[in-house]
Amino acid sequence: MAEPKSFNIPYRSKLTERIEPGQTLIIRGKTIDESKRFNINLHKDSPDFSGNDVPLHLSIRFDEGKIVYNAYTKGTWGKEERAKNPIKKGDDFDIRIRAHDSKFQVSINHKEVKNFEHRIPLNSVSHLSIDGDVVLNHVQWGGKYYPVPYESGIAADGLVPGKTLVVYGTPEKKAKKFNINLLKKNGDIALHFNPRFDEKANGFMCAKPTPGSVVRNSLVNGEWGNEEREGKNPFERLTAFDLEIRNEEFAFQIFVNGERFASYAHRVDPHDIAGLQIQGDIELTGIQVVNNQPAQE
């Protein structure tokens, strides 16, 4: 469930369903140069501080250079847990809160920064509020725990031109590779997208600790075609990513974390993509099929 627009602050929202373990709340926005602090709260029963419990309170503080984590229960604030604030004034940010059975896992700008143990049962969360010195432009929650390897059909007409596959995930600590396959009904692979961490990209001497290449290919009538490997590997171990594969009439347009990565000309009929496979050293947090959005310059 996504709301891709700007929001008034303070922001208040009632969740249409209770948060389940494995789901992720994604919040994107921008701080202002005069920011002192802003807050993200997960509430029980009402999106305010009228006395009901607050299972999670995040206070991003620029005046202290800290992020404060806490919970409010039975009319009392608990003990604060403090950590360094990695967000700078005036910067864009991406904050993710993933729910687990025993904790909230918090990531900022795709890096995990905190595990906050539940003090109030997860199933009590019903509302979200955001307030303070912040510009808010994206709120989304969803996902689940996915098995890997993962295989599924694509609903309705499949991934036809005009549709985008969005994959949210994190390469494992010792990841060597993972792959995403878009399948035709006959089992051919329209697109094999294969980030590899144990190879060097063509034309690049990689100094990062996780160098690699990203192989693109197709399997047609049981035979692999010519590999395409241009470009650095934009994926890093233990760093979350958003991968968009947009199906257009003549090619797949591939974006990683909102940045254009590659274009892959169709080698098979782009109207006949009916299945998805994901394999390898990856933790999946979300999969969506949405309508294509205009490319960002």
UniProtKB/Swiss-Prot annotation:
Protein name (record): 32 kDa beta-galactoside-binding lectin lec-3
InterPro entries assigned: ConA-like_dom_sf (IPR013320), Galectin-like (IPR044156), Galectin_CRD (IPR001079)
Role summary: Binds galactose.
Organism: Caenorhabditis elegans
GO molecular function, one term: carbohydrate binding
Residues annotated to bind a beta-D-galactoside: 224-230
Pfam family, one: Gal-bind_lectin
Keywords: Lectin, Repeat
Origin superkingdom: Eukaryota
Classification via CDD domains: GLECT
Gene (UniProt): lec-3
